[in-house]
Every structure is written in C-alpha cells, then in structure tokens.
C-alpha cells in the first residue's frame, strides 16, 4: 500500500469545499460548503458538518480514506478550512468574544516588540487549535449501516463507525481545556500547550530563550483567560434489548461528546451515534496493574435521536403483497391476537388486550395537558396459568422492552439512580427500567411481591408518563412513555372465592385505577377444558411447536413490522360517537353503584375505553374510530370486570339472558319511548350476548306484549 501524500490530499479537500454545489428548485447552483465557510468566517455558524455522501459523488477513494483514518483527516479538513476562511471573510466580525480580543491584543503587542522581518520564536508560535474558532464533524455515508455495540471490536480502532443504542447515563456539561496558556514570572513570555487527551501534565519551567540564556529558572503559571476551552460531556450507551443474544449481558460503550453535539441526548433516549472509535490509556494505579490494556471510547461526530416510529429500529419497510394478503384476510383481528404466544392454549380475550397494548392509543395534549395513549394491563391469576409466559413473549415481540421482576427490582432500579462518576467524582443520573423502556413496554413479573414503597414509584409513570427526580441536588424530569404490563398472584398464592375481591387482590385503588384492564385468570376444574389443555401441552412437548390450527400463526417479524405501521396512524374520535361513549360510561357508573361493584369505576375508565377504541382503529389502519371499535373496547372492559367478579358476574347471564337483555334495552330509553333496533342489538352484543340470544329475548318479550318491533325491524317501542 502506497504512502499517502497528505499535501495532495489537502488540495483535494480544498477543491471539494470550494467547488461542490447542488442545484436548488429553481436550477441555481448552491455552493453548500462555500455558504458554510462564509457563515464560519462571520461567526454566524459554529460547527461545520461534512457529509461523506457529497464527497462520494466525486471521489469515493477519499471517502474510504476518511473512514479508515478519520482522526488524521479531521485535522486535515480543519487545516484546509482555516486556510480558506480569509478568502470568504467579507466584513469584520461584529460579535467578538474574550478570546478574540485576547489574540488580537497579543498579536498587536508582539508586532510592536518584534523587529521588522524577524521570524517568531517557535515557543511563542500560536497553535492552530487556539486560532481555530470553529468545529468540524463528519456525517457518515448512507451505506454505513448502524452496527451493534458488541460488533465494534479492535479492528475498528481509528475508523468512523455508527452504532445504535439507548442512553443510560449522561454527565453534566463541563469545560474541557484544549490549549493551556502559561505566563513566565521572570521574563513574561507566554507558552502554549495543546492538550489532546482528557488528562495532561502542566508545564512548570519556562522554555523561552531568555530564561534559558540567563538561567533565571522562570516558573510558568496557568493563565485561564488566555486558554481555550470547549464544551465536554460524557455519555454511556447500551445495546437495545432486541440486539442482546439470549442469556447475554447488554454491552455498553462510553461516548465523549464535545462542542455543539452536547445536550442532545438524555437518559432513556434511543440514539444513533457516528464517531471515531479510539483507545485511551488507563491512568494512575490502574495503569500500573493493567499497563497493556486500554479503555475504548467513541468520539462523537454526529448524534441523531431516533424518531417515535419503530420503523428505524425494526427495519420495517413496505410490506409485500403476500404479507398484506396474510394480514388483510377475514378475522385478521382474531388472527393477530391468536398469533401472540400460539404455544399457549386459550386466553383469547387476554391476547386481544395484549395486542392492543402493543399498538397503543393516541396521545392527547389539549392546551399543554398531556393525556397518555399507552395502555396499562395487569394480569392476575392462580399459579400455572401462563402469565409469565405471556409477559416473556410480549417482551420478545415489542421492539423496545424491558423485563424485570418485582422481587428483584427496587424503586431506584425502576425509575432512576444517582451515581458518582468514577473519573470526575461528580453525581450523575442513570435511568432505570422504566426510563430505558421509553416508547416501549415494561414487563414487571411478580408485581405483588414488590415492596409497597417501591411500588408507589411507578404511580407517576403510569399516568403522567414521566419520572420526576429530586436527589442529591439533581432536579429533573425524565421521559418514561411506556406501557406497563404487570403479572401478579392473588394474596396467599391462589384466588380464594370465599374472600372478597379486595382481600384477594390487596392492591390500592390508586394503583388499580391506573390499569386500563385488570384481568383475573382463574384455574377452575372443568373436564372438557382440562382435556383440551392437556392434549395441547402434550403435543407441544412432543413436537416442540404449537398444534396445527385453522390458520398459520403470523411470523414475529411480520407482526412487529405491522404493529410499527399501525403506530404511525393517529385516529380521532368523531363527534357522532361522543354521545354514545358518554351514555355507555354513565351506564357503567350506574351499574357499578347499583350492584356495589368491587371494581373501581372512575373517569380513568372512560379514558381507557377511548384508548382501546383508538388502538382498535389503528389496528385497522384507519383515521377514524367507528362504533364497532367502541363496542369491542366496552366488551373487553366488561369481560375483564366479569373475570374479577367470577361466578357472581356470570350468574345473571347463565340463568336468564333474556332478563338481562331486557334491562339493557330498557336502560337505553326513557319511559314510554322507543329505541333503534341496531343500537339495542349492538349494546347487547357489547355486553357479551350473541345475536341469537338477543333475537330470542326480543321474541319472548314481544309475545308478552312488553314491546313491539315495527315491520322494517328498525325500532323497538315499549307498550
């Protein structure tokens, strides 16, 4: 491999910066980097970003050289820009800072004291880092796909790499010294020391010619006002949960951020970082013990926060015709729900609720007040009903997820911890499981085993979707926009039908009301059901897959891509449904009060119905919520309540469905009035009755002359 001629390379860089242009909409040439040079010369811009895709159009070999030896070419580009700036300076800089005045004053004083034509002494030569008043960063080529942190190894040292992950820790922004300026106490000469590493050894003895000749032993004193500082921040990145192989610990990497790239990311943000992978020698006692080993870090050039859509992360593109055909078949809602954990038998309604949790509702922000769109679900039940298996499957299916258990989690581990940095000794904030699951799902198993003090830490997350921190002088608010999926056992291990609901659940009402759906899964003896379950389990053990069904379950990757597409939709509730939803909620409140319902029905129940309805509309990829969506949301709400009431909730339906249907229709009208046939039928179906049961009740009460149905079967009129 031939040696590079860096003088020739600098000429190439200058030519590119001066001549590269793009055509705008009107066809005029826009010199992209020429305009940036003008702004840099007039201090209207601080950072210059060089897109390697632009260089690739003219010189692909130069792009390869930059990616292979990025640090050297960054200095080369900076020197080229510094030499070009005087050509683009059209006027004097108006807004001068302290360093500008200092450098101008020193240059003027030196010109007065120096003989005309004499060269400057090399010790007093101003370093280029001091004179450079701009920052230069590279944007990686589009062909450079983001890599997993564990794939960045020793062969990437010195190269430009792009990694993707989640920010776990961010330090405070501090000034880092780039050039140290010293003044001699004997001769008054100034000495400059460029600093390349985070640590340096200050100069003590004056190296000027005068002090060396006179042997006066002048000592140097640091002059802070004449030194140059740059903003500096340290960041810790960790792999996404979907990038970690099963059984492995997530890898992390240190990112050093400088200048204009600081304060972009916070703990919990999902970011893509382009930078130079570099080693750094250990210092102090660690260097003596582990002298041959080096720490590695990423010198950030570009930080991009990932958008809300999961498309960037899961690689979701356009669906093929075959995939669209699979999804848009009849009963696609049931098919998608049954594709969740197909190895687990039954739990159809629970799987539908989990599907809606993955899709989520629509966030609302009326006049700054935020109403969450994420759906929270609690699965409570006897041991051995596959609660943990459902949580584990959702954890694998969701693009962003965190899985934790109640016994092994503290309130600090769920929210955020304040840690002391090992290098600087300052206090930094590290996000917990709820922060890392931002815009995803946080699965908490053994929810009932958590200590009460730790459980109260998630109250704010479940409603406000934020975590407020006031620890060790750090006052801040972190985003925790995640859905909570919790699994718990009843008190004393199993559900006791002889005890009341409060005695069995033993969770506070403030917490229960924050769950949109609270599902009780009981293990009741039933010969037919037990036989089907046993056959299902034995088949799975024999063949290591689910039994053959009427349809083929959808692939996990396809489901993830379809859910990502659904989340891009923002359906709204039309005005025509407002009265219907209001009446349904008022009726639920009346029923709960009349029956002394143990479940807590509040305004959050109405918000839960709206969230479930918008999630169903998202699932159908439409922009408007329809009546069927509201009915299905109410049905899921009723089924979850019935699961809590157990036999009490089913008594009325199993004994006399017709009586319950009559009461339901009667609630829709005032005394002596009529009701639309379709409205009454939909309300009864939303309560869990079949059309056949509705028709039988209609005929029975029509024979009793309680009501009459018109010939067109459009209205029901009470006699």
UniProtKB/Swiss-Prot annotation:
Keywords tagged on the record: Acetylation, ATP-binding, Cell cycle, Chromosome, DNA replication, DNA-binding, Glycoprotein, Helicase, Hydrolase, Isopeptide bond, Nucleotide-binding, Nucleus, Phosphoprotein, Ubl conjugation
Sites where the protein binds ATP 2: 514, 604
GO cellular component terms listed in the entry, alphabetical order: CMG complex; MCM complex; nucleus
Catalytic activity, EC: 3.6.4.12
Modification type Phosphoserine: residues: 121, 314, 365, 500, 678
Organism: Bos taurus
Further details from the record: Early fractionation of eukaryotic MCM proteins yielded a variety of dimeric, trimeric and tetrameric complexes with unclear biological significance. Specifically a MCM467 subcomplex is shown to have in vitro helicase activity which is inhibited by the MCM2 subunit. The MCM2-7 hexamer is the proposed physiological active complex.
Any one of the GO BP annotations: DNA replication
SUPFAM superfamilies assigned: Nucleic acid-binding proteins, P-loop containing nucleoside triphosphate hydrolases
Location of cross-link Glycyl lysine isopeptide (Lys-Gly) (interchain with G-Cter in SUMO2): 15, 28
Name by which UniProt lists this protein: DNA replication licensing factor MCM7
Location of the region described as Interaction with RAD17 in the Swiss-Prot/TrEMBL record: 521-564
GO molecular function terms noted in the UniProt entry: ATP binding; ATP hydrolysis activity; DNA helicase activity; single-stranded DNA binding
Region (Interaction with ATRIP): 577-719
Catalytic function, reaction form: ATP + H2O = ADP + phosphate + H(+)
Subcellular location: Nucleus; Chromosome
Disulfide cysteine pairs (residue numbers): none
Residues the entry annotates as binding ATP 1: 345, 384, 386-388, 489
Function description: Acts as a component of the MCM2-7 complex (MCM complex) which is the replicative helicase essential for 'once per cell cycle' DNA replication initiation and elongation in eukaryotic cells. Core component of CDC45-MCM-GINS (CMG) helicase, the molecular machine that unwinds template DNA during replication, and around which the replisome is built.
Domain MCM: 332-538
Motif (Arginine finger): 513-516
């Amino acid at each position: 491999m031939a040696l590079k001629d860096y003088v020739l390379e600098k000429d190439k860089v200058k030519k590119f910066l001066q001549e590269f242009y793009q055509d705008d909409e009107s066809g005029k040439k826009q010199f992209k980097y020429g305009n940036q040079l003008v702004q840099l010369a007039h201090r209207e811009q601080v950072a210059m970003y060089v897109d390697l895709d632009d260089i690739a159009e003219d010189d692909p070999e130069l792009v390869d050289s930059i990616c292979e030896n990025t640090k050297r070419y960054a200095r080369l580009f900076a020197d080229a820009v510094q030499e070009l700036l005087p050509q683009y300076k059209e006027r004097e800089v108006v807004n001068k800072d302290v360093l500008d005045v200092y450098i101008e004053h020193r240059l003027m004083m030196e010109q007065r004291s120096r003989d005309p034509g004499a060269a400057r002494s090399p010790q007093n030569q101003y370093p280029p880092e001091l004179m450079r008043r701009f920052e230069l960063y590279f944007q990686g080529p589009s062909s450079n796909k983001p890599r997993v942190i564990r794939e960045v190894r020793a062969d990437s040292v010195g190269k430009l790499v792009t990694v993707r992950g989640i920010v776990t820790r961010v330090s405070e922004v501090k000034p880092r010294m780039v050039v140290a300026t010293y003044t001699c106490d004997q001769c008054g000469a100034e000495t400059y020391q460029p600093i390349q590493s985070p640590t340096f050894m200050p100069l003590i003895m004056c190296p000027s010619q005068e002090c060396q000749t006179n042997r006066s032993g002048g000592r140097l004193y640091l002059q802070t006002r004449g030194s140059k500082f740059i903003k500096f921040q340290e960041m810790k990145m960790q792999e996404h949960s979907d990038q970690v192989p099963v059984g492995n610990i997530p890898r992390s990497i240190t990112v050093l951020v400088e200048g204009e790239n600081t304060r972009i990311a916070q703990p919990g943000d999902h970011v893509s970082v382009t930078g130079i992978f570099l080693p750094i020698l250990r210092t102090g006692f660690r260097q003596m013990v582990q002298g041959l080993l080096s720490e590695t870090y990423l010198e950030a050039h570009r930080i991009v926060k990932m958008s809300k859509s999961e498309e960037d992360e899961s690689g979701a593109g356009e669906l093929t015709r075959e995939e669209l055909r699979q999804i848009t078949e009849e009963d696609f809602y049931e098919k998608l729900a049954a594709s969740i954990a197909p190895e687990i038998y039954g739990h159809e309604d629970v799987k539908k609720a989990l599907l809606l949790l993955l899709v989520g509702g629509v966030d609302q922000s009326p006049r700054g007040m935020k109403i969450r769109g994420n759906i929270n679900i609690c699965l409570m039940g006897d041991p051995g009903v596959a609660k943990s298996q459902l949580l584990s499957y959702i954890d694998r299916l969701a693009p962003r997820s965190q899985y934790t258990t109640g016994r092994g989690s503290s309130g600090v581990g769920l929210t955020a911890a304040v840690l002391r940095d090992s290098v600087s000794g300052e206090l930094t904030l590290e996000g917990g499981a709820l922060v890392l699951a931002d815009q995803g799902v946080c699965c908490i198993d053994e929810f009932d085993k958590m200590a009460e003090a730790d459980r109260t830490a998630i109250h704010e997350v479940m409603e406000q979707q934020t975590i407020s921190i006031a620890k060790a002088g750090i006052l801040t608010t972190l985003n925790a926009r995640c859905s909570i999926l919790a699994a718990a056992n009843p008190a004393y291990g199993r559900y006791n039908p002889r005890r009341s609901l409060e005695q069995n659940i033993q969770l506070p009402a403030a917490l229960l009301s924050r769950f949109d759906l609270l599902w009780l899964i009981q293990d009741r003896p039933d010969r037919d059901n037990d036989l089907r379950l046993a056959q299902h389990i034995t088949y799975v053990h024999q063949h290591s897959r689910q039994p053959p069904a009427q349809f083929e379950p959808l692939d996990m990757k396809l489901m993830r891509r379809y859910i990502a597409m659904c989340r891009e939709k923002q359906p709204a509730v039309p005005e025509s449904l407002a009265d219907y939803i209001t009446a349904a909620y008022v009726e639920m409140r009346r029923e709960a009060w009349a029956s002394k319902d143990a479940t807590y029905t509040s305004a959050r129940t109405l918000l839960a119905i709206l969230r479930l309805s918008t999630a169903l509309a998202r699932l159908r990829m439409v922009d408007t919520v329809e009546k069927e969506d509201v009915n299905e949301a109410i049905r899921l709400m009723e089924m979850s309540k019935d699961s809590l009431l157990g036999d009490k909730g089913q008594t009325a339906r199993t004994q006399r469905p017709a009586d319950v249907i009559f009461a339901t229709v009667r609630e829709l009208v005032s005394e002596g009035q009529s009701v639309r046939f379709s409205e009454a039928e939909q309300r009864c179906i939303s309560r869990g009755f079949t059309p056949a049961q509705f028709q039988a009740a209609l005929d029975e009460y029509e024979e009793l002359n309680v009501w009459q149905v018109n010939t067109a079967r459009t209205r029901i009129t009470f006699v």
